[in-house]
């Protein structure tokens, strides 16, 4: 379908090169193999030649073109076959992570220029330009699915960039002819703008119109993409005095090292907690090999700061697992850990509070709980110490402080035990026999009443009123009815006073 033919002419004075120019020049450039399944800007259904697709000034840091717009539906992107603008950065930059969109496969390519002694220019001419057949993604036979009309396989999807420098002599011009994307920058300014999918187109640039200063050196950057089947040619004619300021360790002029170093494979240290990256492009690979110069930057924990946890990277998963920060042992303060609060930190509670017989939240100097004293219990129960009470604490069943009378009752029911509230001294009082309750009950003989001895023994006695203390009467009591009688004594019937 497409013919790729790029004709770039860099004219140098014949007098300079006629005697000193070598027969061939080799220039190593960067190539990025693309696969439509990974970047659908390749093998799009639509597209034609378009200018103004990219910015007119080259990014001085990345040194790759940038789209004017990242909107997919604008006319220029549609006409240029850019259906997914977000993947355009990977036309000319490495993206070797298969888990991300836009994956490509960086390679290096040697362009061999032949010196034309008649015209005094160097020429690279390839009318069947498929330099990475069976390379990159196409190492896998399953990726070799794009054929021309003759059912011939080629790798039709790749981009190439050439970053170099030249010293301006004041008379150089160049011409080129090409199809698909071809962009050329001189001094970071776009001088050739042929983007999109198109048949070969030619143009010319007069360097004398670019405002360059003779003797100064300027960047020369060429970007070329093949994005569609079925043909590819390239022809470069150059006699500009270009040179390479440095080569990366892959041998590519001003390369990025990606053509021979993949951070995911070359630099893989099998540690998920490091970010593996290739050496910087200008690294000099001395003793050893490229992996010896790789960088393995520890991953940074992005979890919010938590005073209860340290986050430690898991070398198997690459995740930052929370590791609890041990709380201080405060057992010497009678404190035990109950957990950690992400705002205030470790939380403690007194081990003394679980025992009702300990003073709450109080710890001795030797790290033991302080038990409640009798005075403590007196104050707790009565507000003050009652000297007639004995205070103690019972931890069984969570009872806590208890009290009992200091002066215990006597076993003799006729003794009353009492306590002096002022000094707490115990003393006893004898209870009268008729008041004391020694268990006599009501006597069967109704002429008697209950009576307790001082020892508390029941000894009922006759009612006192039976004896009227009159010697001239005979006192009697009916034991069944309790009726008391006082009959005059016989000897007292004839006189007023009884005689013996």
Curated annotation (Swiss-Prot):
Signal peptide start and end residues: 1-18
The entry's keywords: Glycoprotein, Secreted, Signal
Transmembrane segments: none
Name by which UniProt lists this protein: Protein psiE
Protein's gene: psiE
Domain PA14: from-to ranges: 114-256
Record flagged with keyword Signal: yes
Name of one Pfam family that matches: PA14
Family per record: Belongs to the prespore-cell-inducing factor family.
Main subcellular location: secreted
InterPro entries (alphabetical): Fibro_Slime, PA14/GLEYA, PA14_dom, Prespore-cell_inducing_factor, S_mold_repeat
Annotated glycosylation sites: 59, 314, 341, 366, 420, 469
Species annotation: Dictyostelium discoideum (Social amoeba)
């Amino acid at each position: 379908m497409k013919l790729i033919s790029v004709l770039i002419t860099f004219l140098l004075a014949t007098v300079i090169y006629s005697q000193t120019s070598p027969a061939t020049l080799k220039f190593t450039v960067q190539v990025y193999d693309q696969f439509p399944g990974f970047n659908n800007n390749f093998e799009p259904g639509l597209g034609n030649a378009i200018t103004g697709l990219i910015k007119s000034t080259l990014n001085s840091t990345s040194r790759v073109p940038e789209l004017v717009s990242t909107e997919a539906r604008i006319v220029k992107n549609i006409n240029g076959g850019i259906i997914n603008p977000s993947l355009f950065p990977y036309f000319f930059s490495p993206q070797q992570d298969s888990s991300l969109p836009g994956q490509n496969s960086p390679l290096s390519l040697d362009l061999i220029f032949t010196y034309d002694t008649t015209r005094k220019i160097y020429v690279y001419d390839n009318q069947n330009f498929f330099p990475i057949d069976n390379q990159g993604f196409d190492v896998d036979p399953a990726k070799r699915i794009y054929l021309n009309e003759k059912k011939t396989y080629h790798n039709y999807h790749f981009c190439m960039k050439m970053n170099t420098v030249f010293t301006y002599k004041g008379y150089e011009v160049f011409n080129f002819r090409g199809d698909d994307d071809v962009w050329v920058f001189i001094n970071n300014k776009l001088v050739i703008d042929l983007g999109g999918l198109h048949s070969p187109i030619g143009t010319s640039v007069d360097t004398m119109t670019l405002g360059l200063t003779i003797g100064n050196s300027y960047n020369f950057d060429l970007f070329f993409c093949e994005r569609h089947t079925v043909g590819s040619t390239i022809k470069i004619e150059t006699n500009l005095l270009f040179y390479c300021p440095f080569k990366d360790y892959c041998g590519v002029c001003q390369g990025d090292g990606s053509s021979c170093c993949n951070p995911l494979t070359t630099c893989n240290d099998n540690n998920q907690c490091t970010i593996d990256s290739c050496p910087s492009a200008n690294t000099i690979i001395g003793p050893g090999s490229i992996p010896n110069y790789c960088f393995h930057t520890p991953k940074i924990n992005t979890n919010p700061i938590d005073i209860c946890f340290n986050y430690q990277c898991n070398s198997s998963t690459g995740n930052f697992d929370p590791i609890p920060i041990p709380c201080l042992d405060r057992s010497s303060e009678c404190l035990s850990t109950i957990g950690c609060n992400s705002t205030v930190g470790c939380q403690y509670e007194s081990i003394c509070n679980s025992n009702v017989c300990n003073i709450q939240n109080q710890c001795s100097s030797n790290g033991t709980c302080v038990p409640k004293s009798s005075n403590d219990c007196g104050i707790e129960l009565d507000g003050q110490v009652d000297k007639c009470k004995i205070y103690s604490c019972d931890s069984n069943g969570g009872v806590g402080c208890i009290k009992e009378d200091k002066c215990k009752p006597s076993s003799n029911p006729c003794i009353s035990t009492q306590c002096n509230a002022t000094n707490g001294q115990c003393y006893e009082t004898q209870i009268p026999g008729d008041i004391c309750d020694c268990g006599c009950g009501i006597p069967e003989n109704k002429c008697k009443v209950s009576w307790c001895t001082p020892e508390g023994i029941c000894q009922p006695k006759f009612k006192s009123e039976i004896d009227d203390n009159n010697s001239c009467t005979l006192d009697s009591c009916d034991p069944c009815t309790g009726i008391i009688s006082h009959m005059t004594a016989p000897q007292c019937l004839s006189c007023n006073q009884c005689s013996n």
